[in-house]
Curated annotation (Swiss-Prot):
This is NADH-quinone oxidoreductase subunit D. The keyword Translocase applies. Keywords: Cell inner membrane, Cell membrane, Membrane, NAD, Quinone, Translocase, Transport, Ubiquinone. One of its GO terms (molecular function) is NAD binding. It is found in: Cell inner membrane. NDH-1 is composed of 14 different subunits. Subunits NuoB, C, D, E, F, and G constitute the peripheral sector of the complex. Its main location: membrane. It holds the Pfam family Complex1_49kDa. InterPro entries: NADH_Q_OxRdtase_suD, NADH_UbQ_OxRdtase_49kDa_CS, NDH1_su_D/H, NiFe-Hase_large. NDH-1 shuttles electrons from NADH, via FMN and iron-sulfur (Fe-S) centers, to quinones in the respiratory chain. The immediate electron acceptor for the enzyme in this species is believed to be ubiquinone. Couples the redox reaction to proton translocation (for every two electrons transferred, four hydrogen ions are translocated across the cytoplasmic membrane), and thus conserves the redox energy in a proton gradient. It is a peripheral membrane protein. It catalyses: a quinone + NADH + 5 H(+)(in) = a quinol + NAD(+) + 4 H(+)(out). The gene is nuoD. It comes from Geobacter sulfurreducens (strain ATCC 51573 / DSM 12127 / PCA).
Length: 390
């Protein structure tokens, strides 16, 4: 019997298909994967430790830089956790705008996913189309928050400001074009022979294994597990909206692709419902100890200026205790565990990033596959190193 030699190959950290500075040490028997050891940490910035030296409001910009493709989802999970510790109620208008922005963020993130996933496998046309559509959402981001990526728009107690005049019209014009674009993506990929051959039966992980590994989000639902925090543990008023939660059947890369496509259609559906229910009103809770004063007060009265300065420089005390809050981010369950000692800064903050947990299953999904198929598995997990390394 012929002996075989195991070859060790390094993929990354400078490799286009790893979607960031991810290094994987791969052991191969010929071209068949025997073992994968991910090496992370190249993008570590110490977000959790930095938060211990910043007030609760000053930590919000740090969360933008976790999954930098979905900044408002990061903001949302964090401010919900702090609001739970404070026990404050958020105005209905602010809740609705948060949902709209969270779903636009989901669309924006999924568009990057389908663009890069398709490009990794060789479908360049979808890459160009998806980035064209993403640009429309980026323009909305810029109009609302002043920034295209690191938005820093949500605040403890609500929003940094109300939306601009014409916001509803602009959002409707953008999302009304999306169903046609989704049809185009499906026409280019779903029945494409090369796409089907590269994704069907690839990266299989059973429902039981997916749960055991702690996988969440579209990767979990692609394995047939019907779980979505927006429906099963609702927050920000998601219980008011009607939407489908897609699940896969064959637990492979193709199923995860189909799940995300349907999720994009459902995000458009949720945004339409939220726009229909958007009512006039305040966008910040009436809690002067926590929320910033209106800008007109800051500019026109010394009391308002002092109020703003005190909150910005000293923060606000948060009752002693601990809390865990999770949201359904585009890549899965994003959770914040915050411990307060009664001061204006977190005593400890622990972030549960979905990409970090999902990456742990990469060997289970790819073992026994060809090394060329690993690119498709990485793409279907939709990882981002900003939140993995934190």
């Amino acid at each position: 019997m012929a002996s075989t030699e195991i070859m060790t190959v390094n993929m990354g950290p400078q490799h286009p298909s790893t979607h960031g500075v991810l290094r994987m040490v791969i052991e191969l028997d010929g071209e068949v994967i025997q073992k994968i050891t991910p090496h992370i940490g190249y993008l570590h910035r110490g977000v959790e430790k930095l938060s211990e030296h910043r007030t609760y409001h000053q930590t919000i910009p740090l969360t933008d830089r976790l999954d930098y493709l979905a900044p408002m989802s990061n903001n949302l999970g964090y401010v919900l956790a702090v609001e739970k510790l404070l026990g404050i109620e958020i105005p209905e208008r602010a809740q609705t705008i948060r949902v709209i922005m969270a779903e636009l963020t989901r669309l924006k993130s999924h568009l990057v996913w389908i663009a890069c996933h398709a490009l990794d496998i060789g479908a360049m046309t979808v890459f160009i189309y998806a980035f064209r559509e993403r640009e429309m959402i980026m323009s909305l981001y810029e109009k609302i928050s002043g920034a295209r990526m690191t938005s820093n728009y949500f605040r403890v107690g609500g929003l940094s400001s109300d939306v601009y005049d014409g916001f509803e019209k602009d959002v409707r014009e953008v999302i009304d074009t999306f169903p046609g674009h989704f049809d185009t993506y499906e026409g280019l990929l779903t029945k494409n022979t090369i796409w089907v051959n590269r994704t069907v039966g690839n990266g299989v992980i059973s429902a039981e294994d997916a749960v055991d590994y702690g996988i969440t989000g579209p990767a979990l639902r692609g394995s047939g597990v019907d779980w979505d925090l927006r429906r099963d543990n609702p927050y920000s008023g998601y219980e008011k909206y009607s939407f489908k939660v897609p699940v896969g059947e064959k637990c492979d890369t193709f199923d995860r692709y189909k799940v995300r496509l349907i999720e994009m259609r459902e995000a458009v559906n949720i945004i339409r419902q939220a726009l229909d229910s958007l009512k006039p009103g305040p966008v910040l809770a009436d809690n002067p100890q926590v929320t910033y004063p209106p800008k007109e007060n800051v500019y026109n009265s010394i009391e308002g200026l002092i109020h703003h300065f005190k909150i910005a420089s000293e923060g606000f005390p948060v009752p002693e205790g601990e809390v865990y809050q999770s949201v359904e981010a585009p890549k899965g369950e994003l959770g914040y565990y915050i411990v307060s000692d009664g001061g204006p800064k977190p005593y400890r903050m622990r972030i549960r990033p979905p990409s970090f947990v999902n990456l742990g299953a990469i060997e289970k999904m790819a073992k026994g596959s060809m090394i060329a198929d690993l690119v498709a598995v990485i793409g279907t997990l939709d990882i981002v190193l900003g939140e993995i390394d934190r």
